[in-house]
């Protein structure tokens, strides 16, 4: 089991030969988490991708988990696997693209929630879950205007309905990402809410809706919805200098 190195001499030996290293005060991480929680009043899904932004996936996740966090977001499947093994009661949203049967088997067998935006991916998860005699947990990514990955918002309701008809798929939620442009972000939120409303009008329950990451946590309270995804702000960093002293 992972144990932190706290002895300065041990740290010095471990970092021998390296010109620099990063140190994190976990009390500050707890402080930032508490402030975000008190601000938004909804559930949080911390972003711990890329080895928790270089701070250490397991120690950061452990600290947040001990504070009651249960949802985590990662970009790579191997990180989702590590979290599910280390913290079996946790829930992990994996953004990775899946290639090959072993990846689908791992997602289903570990109980990882997979980001889905193609019918082929949904069908393969369904077929894999059927072989495992279980259900695959999915979050559907909706493209509301960022134009990276996701189901286009105009076709999203039909897509979501088709995915939810697969017998071994369990919908955990819908999510999208902002452009971080004030005028366009309002339109993106409107599109996302329209998708969620139309899906629910069709009788499909949406357990979690998520739009807000770091910037929206500070500037768009109407986008907090059911769960927010704090990223850099958890680690004491904000992309916009004017927000450094925001309460």
Predicted region positions:
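Active-site loop/helix belt of alpha/beta enzymes
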Residues: 2-6, 17-18, 50-55, 62, ...
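Short, conserved acidic/polar surface loops in the N-terminal third of protein domains
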Residues: 84-85, 103-107, 125-128, 149-153
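Short, acidic/turn-prone active-site loops that include or flank metal/cofactor-
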Residues: 78, 96-100, 119-121, 232-235
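Generic structural signal for well-ordered alpha-helices
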Residues: 26, 30-37, 61, 80, ...
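Short hydrophobic/aromatic-enriched beta-strand-loop microsegments
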Residues: 89-98, 113-116, 135-139, 228-231
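Active-site beta->alpha loop and helix N-cap motifs at the rims of alpha/beta catalytic domains
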Residues: 108-123, 131
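A charged N-terminal "starter" segment
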Residues: 1-113, 170
